[in-house]
Amino acid sequence: MLRKGTVALINPNQIHPPIAPYALDVLTTALEASGFEAHVLDLTFHLDDWRQTLRDYFRAERPLLVGVTCRNTDTVYALEQRPFVDGYKAVIDEVRRLTAAPVVAGGVGFSTMPFALVDYFGIEYGVKGPGEKIICDLARALAEGRSADRIHIPGLLVNRGPGNVTRVAPPALDPRAAPAPSSSPSPSPAPSSSSAPVPVPLSFAAVGHHESRAWQAETELPYTRRSGEPYKVDNLRYYREGGLGSILTKNGCVYKCSFCVEPDAKGTQFARRGITAVVDEMEALTAQGIHDLHTTDSEFNLSIAHSKNLLREIVRRRDHDATSPLRDLRLWVYCQPSPFDEEFAELLAAAGCAGVNIGADHTRPEMLDGWKVTAKGTRYYDFADTERLVQLCHRNGMLTMVEALFGMPGETLETMRDCVDRMMELDATVTGFSLGLRLLPYMGLAKSLAEQCDGVRTVRGLQSNNASGPIVLKQLHQCDGPIEYERQFMFDESGDFRLVCYFSPDLPEAPGTADSPDGIWRASVDFLWDRIPKSEQYRVMLPTLSGSSENDNNYADNPFLTSLNRKGYTGAFWAHWRDREAIMSGATLPLGELAEAVR
């Protein structure tokens, strides 16, 4: 088959343990189906020579388009606040020196602030949400020789000059898209080309917030997953060095939790993948020796009928084919406390599920109200659902991790203490407690705090380790455009990093902490460590401040995780958390059915 041209796809992530850039397999599948050659340049395994790797490639190849995936903007860990976008920019700057090909960025992290990042990176294009269809349309336009002012692809973000990024609206917007603010909006800056789309009044709807992106996703084809092939994602190497493979069953989320980026970044409707396509992909991965697969859905049990059907197909193939590689599958899933019934638990176990990570977040109903909600704003579970889920998992032989997140508005010592005590009573395999919330522009909580600030005042609890003064957020319609609105959550007025976070000012901190823009909630961290008896801390993940503990529960460059991988353990890292001290000390532990040495 004669190829129409080459698209280079770059993974700039250099965080370890490594996580396979699943998105690049998705894009590669779509581009190849559309007649293009896709070359993956994976810099994760080139920490010291990534510049030379890029130089060698672009000296030999002339791609018509370069795509860059940005999985995370930062660690999103409020007690650390470590940005990644500066590293991505360094990679992009090097690419710009080596090729004249236009650059398009995407990825879930990118999608949380796409206008600001197109501007910050100085690139031509961006994609918010699933990118497999849009990148093919863009590659096709470039292959046809269309000039920049003739490229109007629905969903594509276009850089029209410094401080001026526009988005080509899809032909039919979600009717539930957020309405324009009632106050008079500022107009978008005029585009530089008269043939560009006419700007619409600045509103959340105008920038594509609260919009379905199901039309952007490929749902019927199995994504091609490879190992050991040049210029492709090496999934087996990632498994050997990172301990997990990945599988997506659906995109988007119909829920509206106030501290979540999924409905905005991936869309407000589920784009459910075909059952056969997903299970074919899982079978291909396990056949390559990648036996531990973790779902990458926002939550696996949302749209539970689809998830049950998928599990039934896995079970059918495992039971009816003695040679099926799915018999070696160990599945790890993210779930919300509800919906989750006995049938679902039994299907998970029969399909080879090893563990369930439960995003319970809290036990108190007054904390969950307005936080963990449906699109209509109603809470969709209570703590009894969490209790039942843990019991069902343990009854069916599956490990559990239950997570709580402290620091939302209204959090007090009483609510935090009660949550700790009740979650410890669950006797989950591991219980994880986090403190503080990293704010991203289109979260419900972030929009609410911007509304309270109204561009003229700060709000107690707004915090950044690098803040040099009070943090005053503007609402979208008060900004010159979406770039300014999004940037304020990552940068200060001088352009320096200032990752904006939130900690409840009602927690018992030292005087002045909640009123200080760079205050550190030390007393709350200390309380959590003191509340858990030392005899129970082996099964608990606790928040840490720099230097406060060797048991850091943040993923990026985590010494425990990297030690696990060097020793050949696989599966979700929390499954080995109870044995962390022995593993870190170098003790040789028997490798059970939930941990396998990759040979």
Swiss-Prot record:
Name this protein carries in UniProt: Tryptophan 2-C-methyltransferase
Recorded catalytic activity of this chain's protein: L-tryptophan + S-adenosyl-L-methionine = 2-methyl-L-tryptophan + S-adenosyl-L-homocysteine + H(+)
Gene Ontology CC annotation, any one: cytosol
EC number: 2.1.1.106
Superkingdom per UniProt: Bacteria
Any one biological process term the GO annotation gives: antibiotic biosynthetic process
Region (Disordered): 167-197
Note: TsrM has a totally new mechanism among methyltransferases and radical SAM enzymes. TsrM is not able to use methylcobalamin directly but instead coordinates free cobalamin. SAM serves exclusively as a methyl donor and not as a radical source, and the methyl group of SAM is not directly transferred to tryptophan.
UniProt: [4Fe-4S] cluster binding residues: C253, C257, C260
Co-factor: note: Binds 1 [4Fe-4S] cluster. The cluster is coordinated with 3 cysteines and an exchangeable S-adenosyl-L-methionine.
Cofactor(s), by name: [4Fe-4S] cluster; cob(II)alamin
The keyword 4Fe-4S appears for this protein: yes
UniProtKB keywords: 4Fe-4S, Antibiotic biosynthesis, Cobalamin, Cobalt, Iron, Iron-sulfur, Metal-binding, S-adenosyl-L-methionine, Transferase
Coiled-coil portions: none
Biased composition (Low complexity): 168-181
Entries under InterPro entries matching the protein: B12_rSAM_trp_MT (IPR030969), Cobalamin-bd (IPR006158), Elp3/MiaA/NifB-like_rSAM (IPR006638), rSAM (IPR007197), rSAM_horseshoe (IPR023404), Tetrapyrrole_Bchl_Biosynth_MTs (IPR051198)
Ranges of residues in domain B12-binding: 4-149
Top-level class of the enzyme under EC nomenclature: transferase
Resulting phenotype, C253A: Loss of methyltransferase activity
Keyword Lipid biosynthesis: no
GO MF annotations in UniProt: 4 iron, 4 sulfur cluster binding; cobalamin binding; metal ion binding; tryptophan 2-C-methyltransferase activity
Task of the protein: Involved in the biosynthetic pathway of the antibiotic thiostrepton A. First, TsrM catalyzes the transfer of a methyl group from S-adenosyl methionine (SAM) to cobalamin, leading to the formation of methylcobalamin (CH3-cobalamin) and S-adenosyl-L-homocysteine (SAH). Then the methyl group is transferred to the C2 position of tryptophan (Trp) with the concerted action of the radical SAM [4Fe-4S] center, leading to the production of methyltryptophan.
Gene, per the UniProt record: tsrM
Annotated ranges, domain Radical SAM core: 239-492
